[in-house]
Swiss-Prot record:
SUPFAM superfamilies listed in its UniProt record: YajQ-like
Protein name as catalogued: Nucleotide-binding protein Tgr7_1196
Membrane-crossing segments per the record: none
Gene3D superfamilies, per the entry: 3.30.70.860, YajQ-like, domain 2
Function: Nucleotide-binding protein.
Gene Ontology MF terms: nucleotide binding
UniProt keyword annotation of Nucleotide-binding present: yes
Signal sequence region: none
Organism expressing this protein natively: Thioalkalivibrio sulfidiphilus (strain HL-EbGR7)
Cellular compartments per GO CC: cytosol
Family assignment from sequence similarity: Belongs to the YajQ family.
UniProt KW keywords: Nucleotide-binding
Length: 160
């Protein structure tokens, strides 16, 4: 029986490249000369630094631009609140990867409400969709693309 997986993944190599490009642009831009503007990548967190709130926002804008250019969905970034103190500002941005249980349940519910002849099962941080016909699976993909689940979704491991 044909099946595919619904996942939410981020290509870490592309993310690292986008962060490096952002840091390179910060280093060369005239309006950032002599400031504490910087960006760091630790595991699944980005930390943006600046002298003031507007600088952190500018770093965020540059990052979003570079990430979009590299083909990563900007929806995978979850900005935290801005922390200011001691003449410096910083913001921690979480990188979302993997489908949480609540979101997975929402996806399964959406598929079941569509009354298509497919089964959806939660398997860890992904949702496996199985059906008898390939056309049904393609309808599920179209349905999920239209639905807003709060995460960028990818479809992989398509088996016939």
């Amino acid at each position: 029986m044909p099946s595919f997986d619904v996942v939410s993944e981020v290509d870490m190599q592309e993310l690292r490249n986008a962060v490096d490009q952002t840091q390179r642009e910060i280093d060369t831009r005239y309006d950032f000369k002599g400031t504490a503007a910087a960006i760091e990548l630790n595991e699944m967190e980005l930390t943006l630094f600046g002298d003031a709130e507007f600088q952190v926002e500018q770093v965020m804008d540059i990052l979003v631009q570079k990430i979009a250019k590299r083909g990563i969905d900007v929806g995978c970034l979850e900005p935290g609140k801005l922390e200011e103190g001691g003449g410096k500002a910083r913001r921690v941005v979480k990188v979302l990867a993997g489908i949480e249980t609540d979101t997975a349940r929402k996806i399964v519910k959406l598929i079941k409400e569509a009354k298509l002849k497919v089964q959806a099962a939660i398997q860890g941080d992904k949702v496996r969709v199985t059906g008898k016909k390939r056309d049904d699976l393609q309808e599920v993909i179209a349905l999920l693309r239209q639905a807003d689940v709060g995460l960028p979704l990818q479809y992989n491991n398509f088996r016939d």
